[in-house]
C-alpha cells in the first residue's frame, strides 16, 4: 500500500516508469491482426528475397538497354620481336539496324522485371496468409484451452454431487470412480490443448518477432459478397498470380522475336584504329565502314531456336489460361466450403444450447435420484465435443475469407478493411 501511495499524484508516464523500475509487469496493448501482419512482413526473409530479385531484374533491364549504345573492343601490347614497340587494335561499333533484336532483349528483361514484381506481391500475400493462419491458430488454441477448463469445472461439480450422494448412502463408489475417470481424461485433454497452444505461440513469435498477447479476434467482411458485386473476371485478371503468369508469357513472346532477329544480319557502323607491323615496319591505320554481322552458325541449331521459343510461348500462354481457371476454381471451392461450415456452425450452436438445457434437467433429476452419473457425464461430454467443434468451425470460416482474398491479391485490403470502400 505504501508503494501505491507514492504513485498517487504523479503523472501517468512517471507512474509507468516507476512500475517498470519496481519490476511490476504492465499489460501489453492489444495487437490486431493487421498490425501483426505488418510486423511479420517487415522481417520475413522470403519477402525480402523476392524484393531483391525484383531489384536485380531492374538492373538487368538497364543492362539490356546497353545494346543501343556503341561497343568498344581494344587490345594492345608489345611487338613480338621488339619489346620497345607497342601495337594495338581499337574498334568502336554502333548498331544501326538489328531487326528488333536489342528491343526484344529489352522487352524480355522488362517483362521479367514485371513478372518478379508480381512475384513480390505473391510472396507477400503468402507470407501474410501464413501469419494470419498462425494468428488464428493462437486464438483457436486459447479458446479450446478455456473450453476444457470450463468442462473440468462442470465435471468437478458432478464429482462433488456424486460424493455427496455416496456419503448419504444413495450410491456406491463406482459412480465416484466413474466421475474421477472422466475428470482424468479431461485433465489429459487440457495438457494436450496447452501443448498445442504453446506450439502456436512459438510459431507466432517466430513469424511476427514478438510474443502473442491480447490478440483480437478479427471480423473480416464476406469476400464472396464483395466479389458478387464486382467484376470477378477483372478481379482475377488483376490478381498477382494471374499477372505473373501473363508476364511470363510476355517474356516468352519477346524471346521469340529475339530468336527470329538473331537469324538476320545486323548492320553496324564500325570505326577501327590500329597499329601493326607491315613489311617489317610498324604502321598506323584507321578505317570506318558499314558492316553486316551475323551470329556463328552451328549446324541447324540457330534455325531451331525460334521453334523452341515459339513452343515455350505456347506453353506459357496455356499456363496463364490454366492459372485463371485455377483461381476461379479455388475461389468456388473455398466459398462452397464456407457455406457448408456456416450450416454446420448453426447446427452445432443449436446442439450446444440443447446440451446445456439437457444438462440442467439431468442435474435436477440426478439430485432426486432419477438419473445416474453416467447420464450426466455423457451429456457433458457431448456438450464439450460440440463446443470444441464449434470453435474450430468458427475460426475456419475466418480462414476461408483470408485464403480467398490471398488468391486474388486482396488480402491486404481485407486486413485493412478497405474493401468496404470499393477497393
Residue ranges and their predicted role:
Residues 5, 31, 126-240, 248, ...:
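Periplasmic alpha-helical coiled-coil/stalk elements that build and connect Gram-negative outer-membrane
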Residues 28-77, 96, 104, 170-173, ...:
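Bacterial Sec-pathway N-terminal export signals of envelope proteins
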Residues 15-25:
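Bacterial N-terminal signal peptides
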Residues 49-64, 123-152, 157-160, 164, ...:
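Amphipathic alpha-helical coiled-coil segments
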Residues 1-11:
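N-terminal secretory signal peptides that target proteins for export/translocation
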Residues 32, 71-123, 243-255, 260-323, ...:
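Small/polar-residue-enriched beta-strand and adjacent coil segments characteristic
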Residues 79, 83-85, 188-191, 195, ...:
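Outer-membrane beta-barrel domain signature
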Amino acid at each position: 500500500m505504501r508503494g501505491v501511495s507514492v504513485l498517487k499524484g504523479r503523472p501517468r508516464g512517471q507512474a509507468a516508469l516507476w512500475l517498470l523500475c519496481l519490476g511490476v509487469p504492465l499489460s501489453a496493448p492489444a495487437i490486431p491482426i493487421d498490425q501483426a501482419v505488418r510486423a511479420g512482413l517487415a522481417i520475413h526473409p522470403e519477402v525480402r528475397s523476392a524484393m531483391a530479385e525484383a531489384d536485380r531484374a531492374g538492373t538487368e533491364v538497364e543492362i539490356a538497354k546497353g545494346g543501343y549504345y556503341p561497343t568498344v573492343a581494344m587490345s594492345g601490347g608489345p611487338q613480338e620481336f621488339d619489346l620497345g614497340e607497342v601495337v594495338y587494335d581499337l574498334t568502336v561499333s554502333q548498331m544501326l539496324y538489328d531487326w528488333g533484336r536489342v528491343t526484344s532483349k529489352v522487352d524480355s528483361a522488362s517483362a521479367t522485371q514485371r513478372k518478379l514484381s508480381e512475384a513480390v506481391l505473391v510472396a507477400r500475400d503468402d507470407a501474410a496468409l501464413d501469419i494470419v493462419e498462425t494468428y488464428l491458430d493462437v486464438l483457436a488454441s486459447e479458446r479450446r484451452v478455456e473450453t476444457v477448463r470450463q468442462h473440468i469445472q462442470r465435471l468437478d461439480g458432478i464429482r462433488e454431487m456424486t460424493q455427496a450422494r455416496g456419503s448419504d448412502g444413495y450410491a456406491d463408489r463406482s459412480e465416484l470412480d466413474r466421475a474421477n475417470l472422466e475428470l482424468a481424461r479431461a485433465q489429459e485433454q487440457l495438457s494436450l490443448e496447452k501443448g498445442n497452444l504453446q506450439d502456436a505461440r512459438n510459431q507466432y513469435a517466430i513469424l511476427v518477432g514478438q510474443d502473442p498477447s491480447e490478440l483480437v479476434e478479427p471480423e473480416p467482411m464476406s469476400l464472396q459478397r464483395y466479389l458478387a458485386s464486382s467484376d470477378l473476371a477483372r478481379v482475377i485478371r488483376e490478381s498477382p498470380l494471374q499477372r505473373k503468369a501473363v508476364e511470363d508469357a510476355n517474356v516468352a513472346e519477346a524471346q521469340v522475336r529475339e530468336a527470329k532477329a538473331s537469324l538476320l544480319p545486323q548492320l553496324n557502323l564500325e570505326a577501327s584504329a590500329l597499329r601493326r607491323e607491315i613489311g617489317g615496319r610498324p604502321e598506323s591505320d584507321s578505317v570506318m565502314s558499314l558492316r553486316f554481322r551475323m551470329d556463328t552458325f552451328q549446324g541447324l541449331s540457330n534455325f531451331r531456336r525460334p521453334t523452341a521459343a515459339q513452343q515455350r510461348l505456347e506453353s506459357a500462354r496455356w499456363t496463364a489460361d490454366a492459372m485463371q481457371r485455377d483461381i476461379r476454381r479455388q475461389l468456388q471451392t473455398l466459398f462452397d466450403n464456407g457455406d457448408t461450415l456456416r450450416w454446420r456452425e448453426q447446427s452445432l450452436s443449436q446442439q450446444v444450447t440443447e446440451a446445456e438445457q439437457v444438462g440442467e434437467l439431468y442435474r435436477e433429476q440426478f439430485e432426486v435420484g432419477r438419473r445416474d452419473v453416467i447420464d450426466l457425464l455423457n451429456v457433458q461430454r457431448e456438450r464439450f465435443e460440440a463446443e470444441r467443434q464449434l470453435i474450430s468451425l468458427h475460426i475456419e470460416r475466418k480462414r476461408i475469407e483470408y485464403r480467398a482474398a490471398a488468391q486474388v491479391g486482396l488480402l491486404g485490403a481485407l486486413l485493412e478493411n478497405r474493401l468496404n470502400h470499393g477497393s
